[in-house]
């Protein structure tokens, strides 16, 4: 199995929570902070099989200190987000020089759960042997939820037919939203350009999904996904601890 590079975009300002420290190190319990959930997905994987790349800004260097606890377990590197780049797409683009051949983006302020016994690393590597891109998605049909997510339209074989970030029209054609995505290094530029034009609402798209490896790539269904970017969601999780 090739080494998998895990990109964690953690350069957001976290204005919804207004914490005095990076939201990624918000404690969920005595042992774990939010960002630990991303590392837990690779627990037991040897150092030579996974590398972590964390994208930060100058106000979030506390993350570097917090993640030092993994220094004997994993290769971890940090890079600043290019100030000329914006949104999560800009954070990921800022880490391009650190990509491996096989890569996965995880959002470090979320909790992603896979079916019991499923290895994220093995599943992603298997998909990237066949496809250049793969969304990890959660099925969803609620209109209000879809309006806040990066939405996908999948066929009966979980292949991607359409994508739009936070759609306002034709919402009911979508049947899920992405929670993470994996890609081959060589496919990155086309895929991120397509996704970014939707995220930034640049108007008439210059790049169609059919022109990218995203089109008809097979997606991976997750068991559950929680975005902890709001106090409402955090309170729900803390009440279950």
Predicted regions and their residues:
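Active-site glycine-centered loops adjacent to acidic/histidine catalytic or metal-binding residues
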Residues: 12, 109, 230
């Amino acid at each position: 199995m090739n080494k998998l590079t895990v990109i964690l975009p953690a350069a957001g300002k976290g204005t919804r929570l207004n914490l005095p420290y990076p939201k990624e190190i918000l404690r969920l319990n005595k042992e774990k902070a939010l960002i630990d959930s991303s590392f837990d997905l690779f627990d037991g994987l040897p150092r030579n099989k996974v590398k972590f790349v964390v994208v930060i800004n100058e106000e979030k260097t506390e993350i570097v200190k917090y993640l030092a606890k993994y220094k004997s377990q994993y290769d971890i590197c940090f890079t600043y987000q290019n100030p000329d780049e914006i949104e999560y797409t800009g954070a990921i683009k800022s880490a391009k020089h650190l990509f491996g051949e096989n890569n996965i983006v995880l959002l470090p302020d979320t909790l992603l759960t896979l079916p019991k016994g499923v290895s994220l690393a093995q599943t992603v590597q298997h998909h990237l042997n066949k496809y250049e891109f793969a969304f990890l998605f959660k099925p969803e049909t609620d209109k209000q939820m879809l309006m806040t997510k990066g939405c996908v339209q999948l066929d009966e074989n979980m292949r991607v037919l359409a994508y739009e970030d936070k759609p306002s029209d034709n919402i009911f054609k979508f049947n899920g939203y992405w929670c993470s995505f994996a890609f081959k290094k060589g496919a990155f530029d086309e895929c991120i350009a397509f996704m970014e034009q939707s995220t930034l609402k640049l108007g008439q798209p210059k790049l169609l999904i059919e022109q990218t490896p995203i089109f008809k790539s097979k997606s991976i269904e997750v068991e559950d996904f929680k975005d902890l970017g709001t106090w409402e969601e955090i309170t729900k999780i803390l009440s279950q601890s």
